[in-house]
């Protein structure tokens, strides 16, 4: 068990008009959202965290919330005279970001801890909250974040979404919504970027890149064998991917095929040979 992070929450969710926005909601003109924990309170936590070398992970969904937390992180680091990048502070969700703030993630070394599946689940109704122009400019700008040097971590935000890494990976590369339309696909990740967001980037965000995140000698060898290659299969077939086997510390812990004995690597080797 490792305890090295502190979670705070500055705003609510966009669907409930709780995300803190720079401008009023398109469908609720008298509101810019909610502030659930004050900037002053979160800043106090951040100051203590710096002194003890802790990571701070702050929930921020709206563009105002993201700007305020970026400002807060930068301000605390300057006041404490520390280099913030090694602290690996994160913004959880980072869903709607003003274009002026996008490059600040990479510049400051703030990790965007996002959930790919949120974009496609929320996509059909986001324009009702933000309007088309603001949605296109601010919502889930993964391509812009990556191209300005940000590290993106990925997940599902369970229980808000099912704990299905394949579904979130598919959303990350396709931006395909359940209505059959794509949500501003120009902001999609490449397949390699999406895979990194779920592996090496998440390991980095958890200070575990020396033991997790890649299949490298000396690491834990925690990995899964999938029914098809996520990097080459037709995009529409990605959701049909099954987990064939799960290995923990190099040992077989789960197999969809009951005939595979624990520790039997022959099938794994044949899959690897086929893919190469």
Kindly give the residue locations of the regions a language model identified.
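Short conserved micro-motifs at the rims of enzyme active sites and ligand-binding pockets
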Residues: 14-16, 103, 235-237, 257-259
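Metal-coordinating catalytic core of metallo-dependent amide/deamination hydrolases
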Residues: 1-67, 79, 104-111, 116-117, ...
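His/Asp/Glu-enriched, well-ordered alpha-helical/loop segment
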Residues: 46-57, 64-89, 93-94, 99-103, ...
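Extracellular/periplasmic ectodomains of large secreted or surface enzymes and adhesion receptors
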Residues: 256-276
């Amino acid at each position: 068990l490792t305890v090295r992070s502190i979670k705070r929450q500055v705003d609510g969710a966009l669907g409930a008009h709780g995300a803190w926005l720079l401008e009023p909601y398109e469908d609720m003109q008298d509101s810019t959202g909610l502030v659930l924990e004050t900037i002053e309170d979160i800043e106090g936590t951040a100051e203590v965290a710096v002194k003890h070398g802790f990571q701070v992970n702050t929930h921020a969904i709206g563009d105002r919330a993201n700007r305020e937390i970026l400002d807060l992180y930068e301000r605390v680091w300057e006041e404490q005279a520390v280099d913030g990048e090694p602290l690996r502070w994160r913004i959880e969700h980072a869903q709607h970001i003003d274009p002026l703030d996008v490059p600040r993630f990479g510049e400051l070394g703030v990790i965007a801890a996002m959930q790919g599946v949120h974009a496609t689940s929320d996509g059909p109704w986001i324009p009702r909250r933000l309007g088309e122009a603001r949605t296109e400019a601010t919502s889930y700008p993964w391509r812009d974040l990556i191209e300005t040097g940000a590290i993106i971590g990925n997940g599902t935000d369970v229980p808000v979404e099912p704990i299905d890494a394949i579904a979130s990976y598919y959303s990350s590369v396709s931006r395909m919504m359940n209505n059959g339309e794509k949500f501003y696909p120009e902001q999609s990740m490449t397949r390699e970027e999406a895979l990194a967001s779920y592996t090496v980037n998440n390991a980095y965000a958890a200070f575990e890149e020396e033991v997790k995140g890649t299949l490298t000698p000396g690491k834990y060898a925690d990995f899964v064998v999938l029914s098809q290659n996520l990097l080459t299969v037709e995009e529409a077939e990605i959701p049909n991917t099954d987990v064939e086997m799960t290995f923990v510390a190099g040992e077989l812990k789960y197999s969809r095929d009951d005939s595979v004995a624990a520790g039997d690597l022959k099938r794994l080797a044949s899959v690897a040979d086929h893919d190469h």
